[in-house]
Amino acid sequence: MASLKAWVKAGRPRTLPLAITCVLIGAAISLSPSDISLDQLPDARFYTVLGLTLLTVIYLQVLANFANDYGDFKKGTDGPERSDRAMASGEISEKEMKRALVVTSTKAFVVGCATVLFALDFDLAKSAITLFLITLGCSSIY
């Protein structure tokens, strides 16, 4: 079983600030100048959606890092000489990484769906159509 240190290394935390910054800049841009007042802060839904979006983007970034580590290992791009990669260095087995990819994908999907539901104010019709179109778009890329 891989150590927590190996999983943190595979998740590459130094890549997270860029993803988080993109979401925070988008959130700041979404606020109108009248919203930026200490007297009247945005409503709780804004912060809920922001928090869920941040969680989603963190899961997606970690998922991308895991997938990159796995793919480079399988193709042979990362060999035993790459001690900075968790799979190539032998700290994480192929079976463990596959399981982590499934778990992280599932978490990202669930939190992403929750984000869409909150963002559309639980309007199930809009949410279902939006999620269907996103799924259709993703499947067309694949």
Mark where each language-model region is.
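The first (N-terminal) embedded transmembrane alpha-helix
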Residues: 10-31, 106
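Membrane-embedded alpha-helical segments that form the functional core of polytopic membrane enzymes
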Residues: 25, 38-67, 129-140
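Short, Lys/Arg-rich, polar N-terminal cytosolic tail immediately upstream
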Residues: 1-9
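Intramembrane alpha-helical segments
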Residues: 85-142
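Residue-level signal for inorganic ion chemistry
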Residues: 11, 72, 93
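Transmembrane helix-loop junctions in multipass membrane proteins, especially transporters and channels
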Residues: 31-38, 69, 73-77, 117-121
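Acidic (Asp/Glu-rich) catalytic motifs at the cytosolic membrane interface
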Residues: 59-83
